[in-house]
Amino acid sequence: MALICHCGLIVTFLAFVVPLPYYIEVPGGSEDIRQVLKVNDTEDKEAGAYQFVTVGVQHATLAHMIYAWLTPFTDIRSAQETTGGSSDVEFMRINQFYMQTSQNMAKYQGLKTAGKDIELKYLGVYVLTVTDNSTFKGILNISDTVTAVNDQTFDSSKDLIDYVNSQKLGDSVKVTYEEDGQTKSAEGKIITLENGKNGIGIGLIDRTEVTSDVPIRFSTAGIGGPSAGLMFSLAIYTQISDPGLRNGRIVAGTGTIDRDGNVGDIGGIDKKVVASAREGAAIFFAPDNPVSEEEQKAHPDAKNNYQTALEAAKTIKTDMKIVPVKTLQDAIDYLKNNP
């Protein structure tokens, strides 16, 4: 009898502590941007708040899995889906690169929209991942910066990707890159990627540098990912150009931001709606872009970010207004026209 009891205790203990090859995603926090952003060395003392929203991600144990199965807005993801095969340390590092790029784009868009001078310089692309079938596996590493392909430089990662996609399968390709401050080059082959296009098999994101006379400082240690771009941009614009724009309201939202002010899709938006509603937000900005053809073919019932956010809001019966946006200007216009 004692042995049975002890075994039961051991199993219970293991259920809570032994990690499985899965992660769980839960509603995270909805934080006041003033905690992590300072613009022009001036405090934002206006009533209300802009909030950026996070999704909580952690290694799953058996106990976590049971909790996730029983709890709304809690998802189970495989380790491959979540980290792309990267270690936890690499995964956090990758998300910090996303955050850095997001902050630079937010500075650029926020100040540019406010009519301030700012220069955005494209330095290349950070290497985030290298696929197992890439001929650059073992050569390129996370945080290396690709600066040229076949001795050609580019003005954006899109231009680089388009060029590489245009090469023929099996073609030789020369990649110039920076590693630990040293310029190096390596040759490999064009391969077929998972999406059927030609490429070199690396995950990447823009590496940029911004220069402005307006000091902007972020304090986001321990926070990663690109999804706060819209709200960072909006906060910068407001403090510089229109301090009363939010008019005392708590305004939350999510979405990436690019150099043209477009708002990009993000993951886990249903959980972000839940987190924002818990913190009393009156407005939630959601990206409103069409579902891609590939996604529509794979999942005919797929919804875009805005539709998913609306559905989540209805489920939790919140009065928070879900507002669709495609650009930073859409968000600004909504706040101006709905004071």
Enumerate the predicted regions with their spans.
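Extended, small/polar residue-biased N-terminal targeting/export presequences
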Residues: I33, G48-F52, V57-Y122
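Terminal peptide-recognition signature
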Residues: L111, F136, S143-V146, N150, ...
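PDZ-domain C-terminal substructure recognizer with occasional recognition of PDZ-binding tails
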Residues: A114, I161-L204, A309-D330, Y334-P339
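PDZ/PDZ-like groove recognition
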Residues: A114-I142
